[in-house]
Structure formats: C-alpha cells, structure tokens
C-alpha cells in the first residue's frame, strides 16, 4: 500500500478551491492522508465540493484529521465531542481520535488541541 500525505489545502479560500479545480493534484498513493486545515467544519458547502468527487475516484481511502483551522469560523471544538467520525463519501472521512485499519496497517488519527509546547 502506498500512502500519500497532504495538509493545509485550506479549501475555505476560494482561490485554493479554484486552483484545485483547474490544476489536478498528482496521485501517488492508494491511501490519502489529509492532515489538517482542509476546510471549516461549519462550512455547509464544503462536503459537496468537487474535490471530494476527485478524491473518491482516485484513492482507495481518504483519511482526514482535523487541524486547528477546521474549528475556525465559530466552531466549538467540544461540540463534536472527543471522539468522532464524519464520512463525506463512502471512502472519504474525517476521523478524530480514531484508529482505522487498512489491510495490515493501523492509522491512529488524532489531533491534540491545546498541546503544551515548551518555550
């Protein structure tokens, strides 16, 4: 299994969404891990973006982990709870504090909000 990684797509910005509409990203993996800052969780248009159709067609599985920007735009971190899953397509989903097994590989998907950083 080949794993491809991306982060910080920021699809909440029209310029980024427009760019991806006309500039297809290279597909180099079977599984795509999107590690945070993809779109605002409260954005009602985000789940129907063309990007998810593309991801659905090009990857066996797309695993999305929320980053800090997912909670921007007045979204309460604890509103969804400590552990949750939100499927955008059959093979495309957000995972918070979840383990997903694909073949013989376990993906531990979590974002530690408010982690202490030493100075």
Task: Name each model feature, range by range.
Residues 82-119:
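Conserved catalytic scaffold of divalent metal-dependent phosphoesterases
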Residues 18-23, 67, 104-106, 119:
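Generic alpha-helix signal with a bias toward terminal, lower-confidence helices
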Residues 63-70, 96-100:
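A short, structured active-site edge motif that brings together acidic residues
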Residues 35-37, 66-67, 109-114:
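Short loop/turn segments at strand-loop or loop-helix junctions that form parts
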Residues 74, 81-82:
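Rossmann-like NAD(P)(H) cofactor-binding subdomain of soluble oxidoreductases
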Residues 9-10, 69, 99, 112:
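Active-site beta-loop-alpha junctions enriched in small/polar residues
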Residues 1-63, 71-76:
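N-terminal active-site segment of His-dependent metallophosphoesterases
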């Amino acid at each position: 299994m080949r794993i491809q990684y991306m982060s910080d797509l920021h699809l909440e910005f029209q310029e980024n969404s427009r760019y991806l509409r006309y500039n297809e990203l290279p597909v180099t993996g079977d599984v795509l891990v999107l590690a945070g800052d993809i779109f605002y969780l409260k954005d009602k248009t985000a789940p129907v973006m063309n990007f998810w159709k593309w991801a659905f067609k090009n990857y066996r599985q797309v695993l999305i982990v929320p980053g800090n920007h997912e909670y921007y735009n007045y979204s309460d971190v604890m509103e969804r709870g400590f552990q949750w899953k939100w499927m955008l397509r059959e093979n495309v989903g957000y995972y918070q504090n979840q383990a997903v097994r694909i073949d013989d590989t376990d993906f531990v998907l979590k974002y530690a909000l408010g982690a202490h950083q030493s100075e």
